[in-house]
Design a protein with these regions (language model features):
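Structural motif
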Residues: 62-70, 139-146, 204, 309-310, ...
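Cysteine-centered catalytic environments shared across enzyme families
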Residues: 1-299, 316, 540, 568
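Short, hydrophobic/amphipathic alpha-helical patches that form generic packing surfaces
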Residues: 76-80, 149-155, 437-447, 556-573
Length: 574
């Protein structure tokens, strides 16, 4: 079972605890999986435990002895002291298990950056870090679940389902209990109760952001880090807090790694990056991306245990490999900031339906100041205010997403043209639910990214997705979180003076269309999609072949085609 993932190392350790056997695998260069054993219990932990020192101190104050400094020992003592609720206290990127008697508890981190999968067999319950490991233990090595594979392609995969037959995903922020012949899965984190629970002014929110973000950044630093630096606001925000303290703490500067595009000027952000590293004194390494989305596709869909939508694993692997070559074990990125501080959909309707008239008036005045007439302001707010049956009917009539769906895809597979799932909710709940959507659903993209990184010997850290920072962001009142029409305005205000004004005042956003289109591999698309016998229901292959012959995909059509190629590669390689 452990041997099914040789990229995790060949140092194998197993321990029998009653009727349960726990095993870990490690690479000599990076031991990130630990095992703790007591006479009647055991624990395993895979990943990074950011707050181990704080937890150990709290346990010792309670009179509990922590056997050693490994994360597994901390988890062991925590479960012994606080039970399964101790998982709520853990911070970091992880999956793990605790065994006592006949019961085993498997757990996964709040946001789902660590991985955990499970399945049932006649002999009982099996769980592992990777789906392929569970698949092997079930006697169904790498057997695809064709229905689930199609669901992945069309974006409708159920949260617990995977692309491998018989293998279940443990959802983020969840734990699974197995004992006495039963298996139950339960969530341990319920962030919905936090939404708009704080009453803070904008100045207080900016101060609170700096406090929480500084803690989030500090937690991720190891002394062997590389920051993937862009010219936006997200990764520069990490640089602003990490770089000044990095050299005093670790004796060298925080290294930045940036992709440059000399042949695609519309994509290149070098001038912004240069301004950041000059102000913060960061060593910079640049590279010209060479990987394309379908490079070595069969290998990657095998490693990631399924096709991945949207994310280009070869391109991620390229920068992780370069980071490792720079000596990094931890790769910092500003990813997911948009889910924490940018989702403002249905803001006007939320303010109106909750009678926050002053904030609503300020929002309308801000739109008017951009030159929009009152009719445009009303149209902007109307869908958020309309009852579900009215809003849904209106958007279906508009069918605006026709340009996002290729003509060779049956619209019925995605719920029909114009379907807006957010508008199917009660109008009063739409903004609140939008703040939480990123914490729901199957997490196949971040799982695939984690497996890619693990295969290259690094962890990917996303300070903006730190649990305490995310909880703080959820707690902010809507009008404080989004005080004006400027994206991430709160972050820009908080970082004024810490980053160049060139970055904080930047209003444009880099579009990567030119780079995406340059990476189109029509020969690979034809090889994987057309030449094989497998067919996905709802895809018009004759029409798709005609489009491939023309070799003139737009960005969205190319992304759909790449996703379909990964589906075919995954099914055919089985």
């Amino acid at each position: 079972m452990l041997a099914a993932s040789p990229h995790r190392g060949t140092e194998l350790t197993a321990h029998a605890c009653g009727r349960v056997t726990l095993g870990v695998s490690n690479d000599a260069a990076r031991r990130d999986t630990t095992l703790a054993v007591q006479p009647d219990a055991a624990a395993v932990f895979c990943g990074v435990l950011d707050n181990a020192q704080a937890l150990n101190a709290e346990l010792r104050r309670a009179g509990v002895d922590v056997a050693d400094e490994t994360p597994a020992a901390t988890v062991m003592s925590a479960f012994r002291t606080w039970g399964a609720t101790s998982v709520e206290r853990l911070r970091g990127v992880f999956g793990g298990a605790f065994v006592a008697g006949d019961e085993i508890v498997v757990f996964r981190d709040h946001v789902g950056f660590g991985t955990a999968f499970w399945g049932k067999r006649a002999a009982g319950f099996v769980a592992a870090t990777e789906a392929k490991q569970v698949s092997v233990a079930l006697g169904k090595p790498h057997e695809p679940d064709l229905e689930a594979v199609e669901d992945i392609f069309f974006g409708r995969l159920a949260e617990q389902r995977t692309a491998l037959l018989g293998v279940e995903r443990l959802p983020r922020a969840s734990l699974a209990r197995s004992g006495r012949g039963t298996i139950s899965v339960e969530r341990y984190w319920h962030p919905d109760a936090l939404v708009e629970s704080a009453q803070l002014s904008l100045d207080e929110a900016c101060e609170g952001f700096l406090v929480h973000f500084d803690e989030a950044v500090a937690r991720t630093l190891t002394g062997r880090d590389v920051l993937l630096l862009s010219g936006g606001i997200d990764s520069p925000a990490i640089a602003a807090l990490a770089a000044p303290e990095y050299e005093p703490r670790f004796g060298r500067g925080l290294a930045a790694l940036t992709a440059v595009y000399p042949d695609q000027p519309s994509v290149d952000e070098r001038r912004y990056v240069d301004a950041i590293v000059a102000q913060l004194g960061m060593p910079l390494r640049t590279y010209v991306p060479e990987a394309r989305p379908l490079d070595d596709v069969e290998r990657w869909v095998t490693l990631t245990d399924g096709p991945v939508d949207t994310l280009s694993i070869p391109e991620s692997a390229e920068c992780y490999r370069l980071s490792r070559d720079l000596g990094a074990v931890s790769v910092l990125t500003g990813e997911l900031a948009e889910y924490v501080f940018t989702i403002s959909a249905h803001l006007a309707g939320h303010l109106a339906l909750h009678r926050r008239w002053r904030a609503l008036a300020a929002w309308a005045r801000a739109l008017r100041a951009t030159g929009r007439p009152w009719s445009a302001v009303a149209r902007r707010a109307a869908p958020s205010l309309a009852p579900a049956f009215v809003a849904g009917r209106y958007t279906r009539l508009l069918r605006r997403d026709r340009r996002f769906l290729p003509g060779w895809i049956d619209p019925a597979q995605v719920g029909g043209l114009g379907r807006r799932r957010d508008l199917e909710r009660r109008a009063r709940d739409r903004w609140t639910e939008a703040q939480l959507d990123a914490l729901r659903g199957a997490s196949i993209t971040v799982e695939a990214d984690a497996l890619c990184a693990a295969s290259l010997g690094v962890h990917v850290r996303r300070p903006f997705a730190d649990v305490d920072l995310w909880e703080f962001a959820l707690s902010l009142p809507a009008e404080t979180k989004f005080p004006d029409l400027v994206p991430k305005s709160l972050i820009r205000r908080a970082l004024r003076g810490r980053l160049p004004d060139l970055i904080l005042d930047r209003k444009d956003k880099t579009a990567f269309d030119a780079h995406t289109l340059a990476g189109a591999d029509y020969d690979a698309l034809r090889k994987w999609i057309i030449d094989g016998e497998y067919r996905v229901s709802g895809v018009d292959y004759r029409r798709l072949e005609e489009r491939l012959d023309r070799r003139d995909f737009g960005v969205m059509e190319l992304m759909w085609a790449n996703d379909l190629a990964r589906v075919h590669a995954f099914v055919l390689r089985s």
